[in-house]
Amino acid sequence: MFKFLRRLIGAIIVLAVIIVAGGFAWVRVVSHDRVYEATEAPYRDVALVLGAGLTPDGTPSTYLSGRLDEAVTLYNAGLVSVILVSGDNRTTSYSEPDAMAGYLVEKGIPREDVIADYAGLDTYDSCYRARDIFGVTSVTVIGQSYHIARAVTTCQMLGLDTVGVGNEQPHATSTWRWGIVRELGSNVKLIADLIQRREATIMGSQETSVTDALARHGR
């Protein structure tokens, strides 16, 4: 009995390693040649900035402000026309999208070119809603560099013409290292979400805010 259990546990461990390693390799194959520095990215209609938390005073976290700065670079270089900020709005006093929009406006981005998605609860939901709620077809997704391969893969597999920009700062922190480890499980979850064809957690009516903004740019 003990020998059987030991073999069973060993088989489970081997299977888990294969699944995790397979997920890691798969997202890198899909995202290959689709990740760029902001100044070198090809044009896409929309920059999709993924939420990354707020400080206690309600301003974007260090990670989030880094992502937003990448969006500013893309917009000012004419590499995107609209910025879609997608994050958590769990309570009336916690709104990542509002904080993100305010940050961008302070950086000189016209408010009419900043669109807020208040139900981007995770990367999958943000990409899904960008497509089905906001009508986005062409996107530069922005996150930290340790998870940009998965972000690009998520949007690409959901049918968006996707490239990605990964912010590198701050790099040498325990949060960054934990993020790298967490990605291993997140890759597997993405595969499960795609197989199950999961909808975004929160859907709602279609919006024309992105397409209206693009129309003002002649897109």
Q: What are the roles of these predicted feature ranges?
A:
Residues 1-39:
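N-terminal type II signal-anchor transmembrane helix
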Residues 11, 41-43, 188:
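Extended hydrophobic leader/signal-anchor segments used for secretion and membrane insertion
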Residues 90-96, 163-166, 185-193, 208-214:
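A general structural signal for short secondary-structure boundary/capping elements
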